[in-house]
Amino acid sequence: MKGGSPRFCIPMPPVLVVEAVEWLLMECAYFRDDLCSSCPSIETAYTAQVQVKQEHARALLANYPQLQWLDPVTSAEAGFRNKAKLVVGGSAKNPTLGIVDYRTGTSTDLGECPLYMEPIQAAIPVLRELIQRADLTPYDIPNRRGELKNILVTASAAGELMVRFVLRSKKLMVPIRRQMDWLQEQLPNLAVLSVNLLREPVARVEGDEEIILSERQTLPMQVNDLTLHLRPQSFFQTNTKVAEAMYAQGREWVREVAPRSLWDLYCGVGGFALHAASVMDGGSVTGIEISAEAVASAQRTVAEYRLEGVDFSAQDAPEFAVSSGTVPQMLVVNPPRRGIGESLCAWVEGSGIDRVVYSSCNAVTLAKDLERMPSYAPVQGRVLDMFPHTDHYEVMVLLQKQ
């Protein structure tokens, strides 16, 4: 690697390990040179990474001897990430797209990070040139000067792109608009283009105000046999292939239970709810999500498929459940890392719902939530490696009322 380009990861030659098993290790120059620490396990054999995550999940849920663990869902080791959060640094003439030290303002270009899907990798040089052409001044964090803070890029499985410019103000909107035709020529797969305003000097990726510049307002995301719609501020899992397996597993559990009614709390753009509806044969499905943009995305999918009995609402999930006065026959929860918390756990514990699907991106809070619901026990579980080369993973459990 010495003397060559340090801006990419290459596989090391296969090495022989015990029992003649070949492991393909990855070496990342960004990681090696202490430029990026986002993938602390990247130099660990992938099979070993998955094994560690399985053991971690099993240890946390060791108090449930009846829990049957299904085979883990693994990921591609590179080219799997469908979203790039690119902090813009440097200058308009020589911009960097990658990460930044918020204390010093020092930026590191990660333009050749191999985790990104190919359409994102191909778009980064174009976006760098756009900054130069339009003279878009990067935001200087320590001095609180400049305009362009971040560029957020999302890719669909079909290769289409959503590109969002996160700005300090509307000052750069005119030069961005002037370059739209050029950008579309360079990126014919560009589906959605928007500006997001983050006026405050805070360490956030995006603000609350979005201005869509393109004619199209949603990025279609093909997931299994469904097309989900993604609006600019809607959350979507960063690993599409593993998300497909996650939703398919949820759908299979719903198929086995065959409920007449189901709630999907923290539903996002409706992945679990819409997959469940496809096997419920006319039952009612309700999706609850705090993000109005995500709910609008889910409602677009409902309208497109002309689904009946499927409703989405922008509400706080625990507040909705506690105040609803009714209970579904089956429940799906897919909370953020903090888990579903005490109030929702208490409601579930007293609800009498027979089966609950709990999909968690933090097995530690999952274990704590299960302790708060002693009348429910996990009967099946599955680890899904949504985030290769990190300590994070998704784990799903099917809970049964005891």
What function would you assign to each model-found segment?
Residues 2-15, 20-22, 172-177, 181-402:
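Rossmann-like S-adenosyl-L-methionine
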Residues 23-30:
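Short, intrinsically disordered, charge-biased short linear motifs at domain edges
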Residues 25, 37-144, 156-158, 170:
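Extended interfacial segments that mediate partner engagement and assembly in macromolecular machines
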Residues 28, 36-39, 113, 267-270, ...:
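Disulfide-bonded cysteines in secreted/extracellular proteins and peptides
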Residues 77-81, 148-150, 263, 269:
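Feature of Fe-S/electron-transfer and energy-metabolism proteins
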Residues 89, 153, 159-168, 227-231:
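Short, aliphatic-rich beta-strand segments
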